[in-house]
């Protein structure tokens, strides 16, 4: 049951990423509005209005929208979606009847934190964008560059043969904030896609690795020493223990195993001869981020005492969070006789009364773990990919709309001068296309690093270690999904440009 909360950090991390992107869209939309209403802002500032008053006026709509969305989300979360997601847990856990009740922590995470992010981010961003004098607003001079640069660009526009190329560059410069937002948006949504698409292969790979890394076909943990007759059975000692996880700020449950010195099941590594040295499993090494040469303090749950060991090796063939020492050393540590044992390694099923068995680790039990994880996370992941696609489409459409809305007069002039819709799209849509293509390729290493780090921190609450399996197919699928979404949105934007009534726009301009 403790694993049921393991998906919370993951969902919270993704929620924060999406809220930050939404905050970017709001901010860029408001900046576009400020540029349109610069003369009005200049008049208001000249009449004594404070910048802070204007900021709150502009961020009111984003806050109202975010608040309304949060309220709607809470209503749906406590009603419609509750029934959908509780079935996921009923499939894997034997739980009592679930009745949703108000939860203050959920309100903070899903409502207060998103509203706070939108409020703080937009306030700081918009306040900076209003950092001009009233005269600058009245003149619509809202650029932080010197006049000689502008004069140089105007000269280039007049003399350069490739007018469209130079004009496109000027559009990119005037909308560089939007293009930066596109890069950030592609980065975050690519993380979401990679995470979602790699989920199923990850669970399959996790199950396969667990089976491959079994020490033996049957591993028994006993309540009390029980003798059996078997040629393949080998005795070992194990105790429940824990290590402090610095990032989680809590103890991580592990198994401490005492292995026979000449074990046929542990023959790939040489057991430490020093009582203060230890071998840890690869999964434990990765989860604690401790490596050869580091020290690890293990707390015995039986005797409630701690001992610090030096890590001398990493054991790759282990399916859980475990550590290994000589059996005689562990027996001495837990104040037992030299011949004490409470477990068996075996290549065949042993005839042991179930009353004396704590647990049996074999291929079937390991497979059930990976299946259970996918049953819990699978429906969430599919929903997650769908929502990420919708989110990406809305994000790109909003940014493209902002760019075209800011340049409607220029587009109208181009149409009057006889430029076709295709030529105009080369100015406004092609730079976005190039930006997205470059971002999809260049950002891949950073995306892989980010998604693995997010996965690591998100899965800290799980008992065990789960590592993302990201193949080339996953990366390609993510890129194709992003490009397909973008093509659909760009076609809509191209249609909007082709239907733009330039006569009406020029007639109504200031």
Where are these regions (language model features)?
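Interfacial "coupling" helices/loops that link adjacent transmembrane helices in transporter permeases
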Residues: 24-63, 394-434
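Hydrophobic alpha-helical segments
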Residues: 2-9, 20, 38-146
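Short helix-loop junctions at transmembrane helix boundaries
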Residues: 70-109, 128, 426, 437-504
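Short cytosolic juxtamembrane segments of multi-pass membrane proteins
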Residues: 131-148, 495-510
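Small-residue transmembrane helix packing/gating motifs
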Residues: 214, 314-348
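Peri-transmembrane interface segments
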Residues: 1-20, 32-35, 57, 203-210, ...
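N-terminal Sec/SRP start-transfer signal
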Residues: 59, 63, 147-190, 403-408, ...
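Juxtamembrane segments of multi-pass membrane proteins
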Residues: 162-287, 294, 298-300, 376
């Amino acid at each position: 049951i403790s694993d049921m909360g393991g998906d919370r950090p993951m969902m919270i991390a993704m929620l924060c990423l999406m809220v930050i992107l939404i905050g970017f869209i709001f901010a860029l939309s408001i900046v576009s509005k400020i540029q349109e209403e610069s003369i009005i802002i200049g008049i208001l500032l000249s009449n004594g209005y404070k910048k802070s008053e204007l900021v709150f006026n502009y961020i009111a709509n984003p806050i109202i929208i975010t608040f309304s969305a949060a309220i709607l989300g809470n209503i749906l979360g406590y009603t419609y979606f509750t029934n959908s997601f509780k079935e996921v847990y009923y499939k894997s856990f034997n739980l009592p009847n679930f009745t949703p009740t108000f939860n203050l922590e959920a309100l903070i995470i899903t409502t207060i934190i998103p509203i706070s992010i939108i409020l703080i981010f937009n306030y700081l961003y918009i306040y900076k964008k209003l950092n001009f004098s009233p005269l600058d607003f009245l003149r619509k001079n809202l650029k932080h560059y010197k006049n000689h640069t502008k004069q140089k660009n105007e000269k280039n526009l007049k003399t350069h043969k490739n007018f469209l190329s130079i004009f496109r560059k000027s559009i990119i410069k005037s909308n560089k904030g939007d293009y930066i937002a596109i890069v950030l948006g592609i980065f975050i949504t690519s993380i979401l896609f990679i995470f979602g698409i790699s989920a199923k292969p990850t669970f399959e790979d996790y199950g396969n690795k667990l089976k491959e890394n079994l020490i033996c076909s049957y591993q028994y943990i006993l309540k009390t020493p029980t003798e059996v007759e078997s040629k393949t059975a080998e005795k070992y000692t194990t105790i429940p223990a824990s290590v402090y996880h610095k990032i989680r700020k809590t103890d991580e449950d592990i198994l401490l195993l005492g292995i026979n010195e000449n074990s046929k099941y542990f023959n790939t590594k040489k057991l430490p001869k020093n009582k203060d040295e230890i071998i840890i499993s690869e999964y434990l090494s990765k989860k604690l981020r401790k490596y050869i040469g580091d020290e690890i303090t293990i707390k015995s749950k039986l005797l409630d005492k701690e001992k610090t060991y030096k890590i001398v090796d990493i054991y790759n063939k282990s399916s859980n969070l475990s550590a290994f020492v000589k059996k005689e050393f562990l027996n001495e540590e837990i104040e037992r006789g030299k011949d004490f044992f409470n477990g068996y390694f075996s290549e065949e099923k042993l005839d042991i009364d179930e009353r004396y068995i704590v647990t049996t680790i074999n291929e079937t039990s390991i497979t059930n773990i990976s299946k259970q994880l996918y049953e819990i996370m699978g429906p969430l992941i599919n929903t997650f990919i769908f929502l990420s696609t919708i989110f990406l489409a809305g994000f790109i459409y909003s940014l493209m709309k902002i760019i075209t809305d800011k340049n409607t007069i220029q587009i109208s002039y181009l149409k009057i001068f006889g430029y076709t819709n295709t030529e105009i799209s080369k100015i406004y849509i092609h730079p976005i296309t190039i930006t997205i293509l470059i971002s999809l390729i260049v950002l891949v290493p950073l995306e892989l690093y980010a998604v693995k780090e997010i996965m690591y921190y998100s899965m800290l609450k799980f008992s065990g270690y789960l590592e993302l399996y990201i193949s080339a197919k996953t990366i390609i699928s993510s890129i194709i999904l992003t490009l397909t979404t973008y093509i659909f949105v760009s076609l809509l934007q191209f249609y909007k440009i082709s239907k733009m009534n330039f006569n009406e726009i020029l007639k109504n301009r200031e």
